[in-house]
Each structure stands twice: as structure tokens, then as C-alpha cells.
Amino acid sequence: MTTHAAEAPTTDPQGAPGSQKTPDATEAEEAARATVPHRAAAAALAREHDVVPLHQEFLDDSVSPVTAFAQLCGPDEAGFLLESVPVSGGVARYSYVGHRPVPLEPTGGDPLTALRSHLARSVAPVPGLPPFHGGVVGYLGYEAARHFEDLPLAAGPPPGLPESAFLAADDLVVFDHATRRVLLMTLYRPARESYDDAVARIVRLNRALRRAPAPAAFSGRPLAAATPADHGTQGWTANLTEAQFTERVARAREHIAAGDAFQIVLSRRLSRPLRARPTDLYRHLRATNPSPYMYHLSLGGGRHVIGASPELLVKAEGRTVRTRPLAGTRPRHPDPAEDLRLERELRADEKERAEHVMLVDLGRNDLGRVTEPGTVRVERLMRVERFSHVMHLSSTVRGRLAEGRDALDALRSAFPAGTLSGAPKIRAMEIIAELEPEQRGVYGGALGFVGADGLTDFAIALRTMVVADGHVHVQAGAGIVADSDPAAEFRETLHKSRAMLTAVRRAEAAA
């Protein structure tokens, strides 16, 4: 990707092509008075920093993150919605909606090298801001690992999205669910614009939220309960049939028996024509499978990445970096007693425990390459986390970045996740390229953001739907080890796909 983003096309508040109305003098002055930091304070900060975050409070409790995204991002425009939905009580504090982000053009080279150029040297500290207040949002596809290691690619190309894609986002709507505030934010860059120019962007964002009609699809109708037919695979085309997948599992076990790897994560893709709007897919996925990482990334031109990932790949705040592997799976059961029995079964399963410990060790090694010696610690080990359709064993690994290393170095070291590739990672990926018929694309990669100040938070791209060329694609995998049962591993791919299949069926039924 290039290090300079082109100017975004102008739009009117409805999202149609046209010129943007400039605030008149009175409106501009009122907006400046409502903006924090105020003009004089921002000028003082601008003398010391490259970027000054500005914000206004938006007073309209009828706007939600989902409706704001639908209002601000037309069906063929670039935009994003990032949320965290709690799965077991509590409040997930922030949701972010990007307004008119600028796509970064791909260069064909190392995507992380290009991303580093978008980090500001210094971002002004402004009290009371959310953690992410602008930067770059996007994904690294699984095959982007070829820029970091000498790796082969599977023969077939993935569905029609670029290998990696990022959007430069200076203008945001931020929902603070703890304080029930909505903030309109922009990054003021004093070297290339005036304070009034930055405030004018907030004014246009305010207008767009107030004047755009709410989409009919978000009428508040209750969502019907899912049925077994919702997550069936009838009408879907698989890139590996059950027989083909189980045959690949047998071949993976042969590699493991030969000492080539300890674990190999094999996946299969399901595809079908899409007869619903991508925004409705996200709405239904959010309802059926709330997850710590929820995202709808629109690349424009009818291309979307919509997901509900449970798993952190890398998060870096200051010098502290974390990864959180999930490995070991059981389906959820509606009967609490049976659900508890499945949890006990998961905790006692020696195969699942051994697989999980192996992947925790892989995470420790990944962080160890970029952290100070002796700082890598396992904060918690093998807790059970429940999601709507499955439960997983979860652990958290933490370290302190070494001098001269940054968050993007940690992302490079951990990418792709061992939980989506195997161990040892490089050899497992070589075997995956041999056994899977197509490149994975987004699946198994990572999606998240790099803040202008360096804050980095990337989830593993799983439980993720790709929309391209009028089709929707879902993909799920299973970790193959020496004693894997091929039929059980196939069933695991179905369990992991259920939430996405349900979201598609329900969105189409409501269309």
C-alpha cells in the first residue's frame, strides 16, 4: 500500500456524489466554541505535537452504532464499524464508526512497512478521549505472511478481495457506552490544515448524522429465534466436501506421524449468492453471536468483511503487548446442566489441553522475539470462555516490548495466529498450502486498527464473512493432531460456522 492516501471523493450528507457544503461564519464559530480543545489550547498543543485530536459531543440518543454506520456509509462506499459486545455481562465501553475513511492503495510489498509511515511522531494528550481516536483500520489476509516468511501459496485465489486492505481514518463517531455519550472526532494536523478546516469536518459529520434518513432495515423489529434449519448448509457450495475434508485430515495426520508438525489447522469454505444487505448480515451476526471483536469493514464496490471474532491476536498499549490464544472447543447446549457437563468434558480432555498448552507456548515464543528478556508471562491459563454457539479454552500471554521494537513488530512476529495455522507454524503453513485447494484470503489473517499514537489492537479473522461479487463466503477450521478423528474434526468446522450460517439465513429471511 502507498504511504500517501488520495483525497476522498466529496459527498453530500446523504452520501451521494456532490460538493460538501462549507459551514457559514456563524455556524463555524459556534462549532469552534463547542470543540475541545478550544482554538487557543489546540494552538498551544500544535506547537508541540504533529496531531491534535478534536471532538464535540453529539446530543441525540436516537442514534446507535449500527444505525450510524448505515447512515454514514453508503452501500458502495468505504467505511467501518468496530464494536465489542460483552458475552457474559458487563459493559463493552466503546464503538467506533469511521466517516469517509480513505482507502490506502496496495503496493504489493510488505503491508506493515507501509502502515508504519502513518504513525504520527507525536499525538497531543487530550483528557477524556477513547483509546482509539483515529489512525488506520483494516485487515491482513492470511497470505500476507509471505511478506514476513518464505512461504508457498495455495493454488486457487481467494474470493475477490485484496490480500490486505487498510483505510486511513481521521473522522470518527465514537459511542461511549459507559457514560452514554456520543463523540464526533477528527484528527487536526496543523502542518497541513487550519483549526477551522478540522472543525468544518466535524460540522459535516454532525450534519450527516442528523439529516440522513434511518434505514428501514433498522426498525427495531425483534429478531426471531434461530432454528436448526438456520445453520444448515443446504444451498451452500463447499470448496471441500465432507469426504475431501476427512481425506485431507488423514493426510495431515500422516505428516504429523512423520514428524513434520505437531498440529495442522485445516479449514473449508462455504459460499452462496447473497440475497440480503451486508448491513443486515452484521445486525443478525451481532444478535446471534456477540463477541469481543465485532466488525463491519466496507471497502467499497460491494466488498465487505463482517465478523464476530472471539480471539485477540495482538494488543499493544505503550510498551505492554498481549496475545490471547483460544484452543479447545465444545459446542454450547441450551440446557445449563448439559452445558456444564460439556465444560467439564472440555477441561478434562487431554488432547484439547495438550493442544492448548502447545499454542500457548507458541504465543510465548512469538512475543519473546520482540520483548525484553524475562518479561513474557502467562497471565491466565486455560479458562473456559463461552460464546453463543461454542465454548473455548482461553489463556493470556503478556510481555514488554524491547527497546527499538514497536507494536507492528509484535504483530509481524505473531502473524498469523498459531491457533489458525498450527505448530511449528512455518511447517504447518507449508502443509496447509499443500492440502487446502484455495488461498484463505481474509480467513486466518487479522483485522483491527493502528492508532495514530501507536495503540494497536488486532483480532484473528475468524467467525468472519466475506462479501464480494454478489456472494457471501464463510470459512472455519479444525486443529488436527496425531489422534484426531476425521469425522469429529469435520463436525467442528460445522459448529464454528453455525453463527455465520444463521446470520445469513435470518438476514435473507428478513429481506
From Swiss-Prot:
GO molecular function per UniProt: anthranilate synthase activity; metal ion binding
Pathway connected to this protein: Amino-acid biosynthesis; L-tryptophan biosynthesis; L-tryptophan from chorismate: step 1/5
This protein's name: Anthranilate synthase component 1
Gene: trpE
Subunit record text: Heterotetramer consisting of two non-identical subunits: a beta subunit (TrpG) and a large alpha subunit (TrpE).
Lineage: Bacteria, Bacillati, Actinomycetota, Actinomycetes, Kitasatosporales
Residue ranges, compositional bias (Polar residues): 11-23
Catalyzed reactions per annotation: chorismate + L-glutamine = anthranilate + pyruvate + L-glutamate + H(+)
Cofactor: Mg(2+)
Cofactor descriptive note: Binds 1 Mg(2+) ion per subunit.
Keywords carried by this UniProt record: Amino-acid biosynthesis, Aromatic amino acid biosynthesis, Lyase, Magnesium, Metal-binding, Tryptophan biosynthesis
Source domain of life: Bacteria
